[in-house]
A protein has these predicted regions:
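Transmembrane beta-barrel domains of bacterial outer-membrane proteins
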Residues: 9, 20, 25, 29, ...
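Transmembrane beta-barrel strands of outer-membrane/channel proteins
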Residues: 16-20, 70-74, 103-107, 134-138, ...
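Outer-membrane beta-barrel proteins
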Residues: 44-46, 80, 122, 146, ...
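C-terminal/domain-terminus segments
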Residues: 70-84, 214-220
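Extracellular low-complexity, Gly/Ser/Thr-rich intrinsically disordered linkers
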Residues: 187-203, 207-213, 229-232
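Outer-membrane beta-barrel "beta-signal"
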Residues: 220-232
Length: 232
């Protein structure tokens, strides 16, 4: 786990941290609450930089729902070193009473290459408590081959209150899809969960998921997980 320190600087909010995400102060327009480590990023897989390391960032709230944030993260052995894999990102967001929109952009160093990613996210909340969230990310890889220089990720999820808890389901790409020989693969993941409080201090969230095989000869993977959260 990482450690971070957040503090005000004028009208802005600033953070510094170790083993934290550079996107810690980003506002990603997604209200989906699934517990898996694949679809919970709402397709903001790379633009919302989450590689850990030494991180810094700042956010500013303009009021009326508009915010802007920026972040950077560096490997443990160096900061802004030409030989290190650093990442820089910016996030713009608008949040209203029943919907939100956000745009995230990142430049991620990969050795001597500089890859860029752009993520678009949005959600809408109905009066009955039902929420729909969606996201799409596209990337441009700094490689010599024009047939393998793009990435994609997408997501759509729905969630809302059912009984004492929250029911949700989503589908999307299982991580980032990378172009190969001019063809973008499509490996989808599906999941459904129900999160409910056992008592005032404990919440249990069972989830079932399926990940499609990466090829015709690769079998689909189906599994179940249970997340237990405690609060004191």
């Amino acid at each position: 786990d990482g450690i971070s320190y957040t503090f005000p600087l004028g009208d802005a909010t600033v953070f510094v941290g170790d083993n934290t995400d550079g996107s810690m102060l980003f506002t990603t327009a997604c209200v989906y609450g699934g517990p898996s480590n694949s679809l919970d990023d709402c397709a903001n897989v790379n633009a919302g930089i989450t590689g850990g390391g030494v991180s810094v960032g700042a956010a500013y709230d303009f009021g009326s729902g508009f915010t802007i944030a920026g972040g950077a993260q560096f490997v443990e052995t160096g900061i802004a070193d030409k030989e290190e894999d650093d990442a820089y990102a910016v996030n713009l967001a608008y949040t209203a009473d029943s919907y939100g929109l956000s745009l995230s952009y990142a430049n991620v160093e990969d050795g001597v290459d500089n890859d860029t990613y752009t993520a678009l996210n949005g959600y809408y909340s109905f009066d009955n408590g039902l929420n729909i969230s969606a996201g799409f990310e596209f990337g441009s890889l700094d490689v010599s081959s024009a047939d393998a220089d793009e990435t994609e990720a997408f997501f759509i999820g729905i969630n809302g209150e059912v009984g004492p808890g929250e029911l949700g389901a989503a589908l999307g790409t299982a991580g980032t899809m990378t172009e190969a020989s001019g063809v973008m693969p499509e490996q989808l993941m599906y999941e459904a969960y129900y999160s409910y409080p056992v008592n005032d201090g404990m919440t249990i969230t069972p989830l079932i998921y399926t990940v499609e095989g990466s090829s015709a000869s690769d079998m689909d993977e189906t599994g179940v997980m249970v997340k237990t959260s405690f609060s004191f």
